[in-house]
Amino acid sequence: MLLADFGADVVKVEQPGTGDPLRQWTTGGVPLWWKVYARNKRYITLNIKAPEGRALLLKMLPRFDVMLESFVPGTLEKYGLDWDTLRAAHPGLILVRISGWGQSGPGSRRPGLGTLVEAASGFAAMTGDPGSARPALPSFPLADMTSGLYAVNAAMFALYHRDTHGGPGQVVDVSLFESLFSLLGPLPAEYAMSQKVRTRLGNQSTNSGPRGCYVTSDGHWIAVSGSTPRMAERFLESYGLGELLQDPRFATNEARVRHAEDLDTAVRAAIGARTLADNRAIIDANALTAHPVQTIREIELDPHWQTQPLLVDVPNGSMNVRMQNVIPRLSETRGAIRSAGGDLGADNDAIFRTELGLDPAALARLREEGVV
């Protein structure tokens, strides 16, 4: 999606008849996940299990810089589309391979869905309520999205090496596991040093305090971050809790982390004694590092975001699909949303006939045989 947002010609290749599973994630019968995350692409169907399907893929390759696949490792090789075959068709090809556990190793061919990786990576074990034995999974495809961002960066690195330094095409191996594991901070270093497994802290932090979400007297929630000593001190002083800084339990950042529960009790009481409006007045007047917890409703009503191009309504048939706008915003080469995710095989004729030169009869036969 990111490359397509900035003008790349991205062709989504799907299985004839069924298409990408994302098309089945519907809201009110509308595949909104597909509409948003498959935007700005072209869409063809192609069965690579069929010899003619593989031949068409190899014929297409020289027209493109990057091929991205997310099959279980070994699938391309099973169908005769190994790296040697692909680079023979296109020596400068960048092949980006996304999988759950990486392309090699004894576990590489296990099912590698994002939920499994979120469980296996340590993320779920360290996320959730410390008072509960139940680990917590994210409510959105975190591992998939993280690996996708790594894949985009890797493709650009490889293209830069090829086009600027005269390098060859190459294979990029991106695993969901390593992508998510890389976000967990110094977890391996902590374990190597202490041999202790980090436990769930809820909304608290191992690095600073106060940190958490606290309910107001009228039932709203405020998130607080004291991630630097001065931020924490200013927060406590602004809420009339400055005397806590004279208490050895809260005098330093290290002490505040060590006594996080006691600090939480004081902060919870201070925020809980005030309405959302009163808390916001203190936060804004003192430039505190705290903010109300917002839903999409509050985000759309936020005066700041109402002045920014955060959202865009994209025409799609008889409806508009509201979605997040292109980011990042570049001053000279801004991206754009040209279309929402399209229909299965919408560009078969344009690509197979106009660009690859298949005649109508040949394309009709391939369609009848389930090749496209």
Question: Which functions belong to the PLM regions below?
Answer:
Residues 1-165, 343, 347-372:
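N-terminal helix-loop segment corresponding to the beta1-alpha1 unit
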Residues 17, 101-102, 176-181, 218-220, ...:
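Glycine-rich beta-alpha junction loops
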Residues 18-19, 192-198:
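Short Pro/Gly-enriched beta-strand edge/turn motifs at strand-loop
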Residues 103, 132-142, 163-180, 199-206, ...:
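Conserved Rossmann-fold dehydrogenase catalytic segment
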